[in-house]
Amino acid sequence: MSRVCQVTGKSPITGNNVSHANNKTKRRFLPNLQTHRFWVENEKRFVKLRVSTKGMRIIDKVGIDKVLSDIRARGGKV
């Protein structure tokens, strides 16, 4: 399973660890992904999504129905 948010599309980015001596080594910054079940009232079932915490806030604000329709319009499987 890839580390990509199904709502926002956030994915890992690369950067550097920087030591006290200013030595730099490559690292990855991973998104804060959570697997969460959401109840979809009009389908009378739970939908399991892998979303970032920002994606959860978006679902709280606009609603799960709107988010699911956007995911399906992009061709995502839900």
UniProtKB/Swiss-Prot annotation:
Gene3D superfamilies: Ribosomal protein L28/L24. Belongs to the bacterial ribosomal protein bL28 family. Residues 8-21 have a biased composition (Polar residues). GO terms for biological process: translation. GO terms for cellular component: cytosolic large ribosomal subunit. InterPro entries: Ribosomal_bL28, Ribosomal_bL28/bL31-like_sf, Ribosomal_bL28_bact-type, Ribosomal_bL28_sf. Residues 1-21 are annotated as: Disordered. This is Large ribosomal subunit protein bL28. The keyword Ribonucleoprotein applies. Pfam families: Ribosomal_L28. GO terms for molecular function: structural constituent of ribosome. PANTHER family: 39S RIBOSOMAL PROTEIN L28, MITOCHONDRIAL, LARGE RIBOSOMAL SUBUNIT PROTEIN BL28M. Keywords: Ribonucleoprotein, Ribosomal protein.
